[in-house]
Amino acid sequence: MAKVSAPLDWTDKTYFCCAVTLYGIAMVYSVFLWRKGFQRDDWVVYGVLAGGLVLHTVAMAKRGFNLQACPINNLYEATAFIMWTIVAVNLVAGIWQRFRFVGAFASPLLFVLGVFALFPDMDPELANGAHEFSGALSSLHKALLMLSFGGFGLSAVGAVMYLTQEKDLKMHKFRAILSKLPSLERLETAMTRLVWIAFGLLTAGLIASSAYLHQVKQVWFKADPEMIWVLGVWAYYLVLLVLQKRHVHSGRRFAWGTLGSFLFVLLTFWGVYLLSPLHQASNAAS
């Protein structure tokens, strides 16, 4: 009798491809929710994203066990970690009915990031033993920074929801009444809290990065492109939060600031990473 082989020998990249496919399916279904004005409580996107998270988690776990360290060592792994954070927090928020539609706004971002991460140059093949790890601080500072970017990504999703709801209230009042999206006040509160949490993670990541740099280079700061870039991002979000705290910004301006800042992070992170001598030490050595 012929044996049926189970897909237990799939590579981590195969699991990740399957997860990205599910994110794409969620994105396509989300188009119908957008067109209907989010007037129906729907579990489909939530369920598809949950399935994607399971596959995504398996992919990251397999990569981590193979490396025997936190799997954040190149652009593919960093992108996958950011995506995982966004999906996980989205599913937790989706427990509450009014925030279940966050997935409809997050799925396009997840699909685009997933396709981008699968580009061949994002995950170069290295010889056995090519990875170098320097203990807990190495994994800690990467994890904190990636978690913070995931939090900023979720706040940007909240900003899109806020701007969508605000537009409906102005242009399509009847559709806004029937919509199951949260109120503008709740969305603004959620945005603000997400930015504060992500900012705290970014601050902790900067401290851990400085400690890690001192561990390996005996200096607390180095004029590296990525370090300067992260400090610039930190300063921008600090100003954004201070202005929001003092009620200088309206909810609409805060939403645009949150969305614009994350788009800046999304579009510039990859280039800065490639320009960073600290993160391209292996390439310089070769």
Give the location of each predicted region.
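Juxtamembrane membrane-water interface segments that cap and precede transmembrane helices
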Residues: A2-D9, E132-F133
